[in-house]
Amino acid sequence: MNENYQPRKPFTPQQAKTIVEQLFIQAERLDDTALGQITRSLLSVDEIRPQTVHIVFDRAFAGALRHAFRKEPLKSTEQIISLPDILSIGPVESLHTDEGIKNRFCWLQEHLRGDIQEQENEFRCAVQDIKRIPPHLPIILWAGNNAAEQTGLRFATYLLSGRPNEISELNTTKAFESLYRTTKHSEEIHILRSSELSPEQLLELYAHYEPWKWNPARRIAIEQEGKSLMYDGSYLRTWQYDELWSSDEDRHDSFIMECARQLQSEYPGEYYNVLRLIGQVYGELEQYTGDTWIEYRVKELIRHGELASKGDLGDWRKYEIGVIEDHRTIPNIDRDGF
């Protein structure tokens, strides 16, 4: 698919009028060179307009897709809207409203590190971009098999409720496995996030993998799931059995503690830098939450006495942690950073 350039659509009456007016002006001046330039530029008016809108749910993935579409004609015909937030974590209740957006980013500001204000601004811009998509343009939603992107897919679909646009879904996990899985490597080929794909792979996927064009029943079902999310008071979502689930915040705490004990065995009776734990959990966790969520849960485990810490909890480069099996294992328990 998408290997052949789509033909130019007919001019609107206003465009035709503009062409005629400018051609007459140039003809009167007997400027053949300018006349040719004007004609060519006006005939390309429709060609530079987007013909497909792609909505993605990962900042890094958006960058890779833009790189894949950097050459003509795709550069002009494909519009990319990025909803750059990890929607598997934090509140999403009433996220389609101004108050819901404020509540989400206030919570993120209070619990996670990062430039939350910039994230909020980008999120608001993306929501407005989705709402302003022209009704005649087809939309492709890109998402992998993870809660962050699947939550975004449902939220975007809910924002598009009642719109006449044709919607298709391109599941990057399934597409990648379909195109690249071989008998020899059948168990090794797996991606968790769309951003794991290179621009070259994305271009190949777009050329050779047919997105799933939703029928009315599928669209209504996803819209309803998106609507349900707007009433969901949980702060963590997971993807299991091809479905999105609301989960308790502490769902991954036992796994974090398992990793913490493994690392503690390398430093018996000592502290170690928290980034070692965050990195190990991030690399092994089968759900995508982002590293700042993992640090948030580590701090909660410190707060509840499962882990000890020393140093500045405001900077993850400057504090260390240790496992507390009882209060005598690691000395100098420090909870003053809260």
Language model features with spans:
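Short acidic, hydrophobic short linear motifs in intrinsically disordered regions
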Residues: 267-284
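Short amphipathic alpha-helical interaction segments
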Residues: 287-303
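A structured, charge-rich N-terminal accessory region that forms the first stable segment of a protein
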Residues: 24-116
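A conserved mid-domain beta-alpha-beta active-site/ligand-binding segment of alpha/beta enzyme cores
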Residues: 186-268, 272
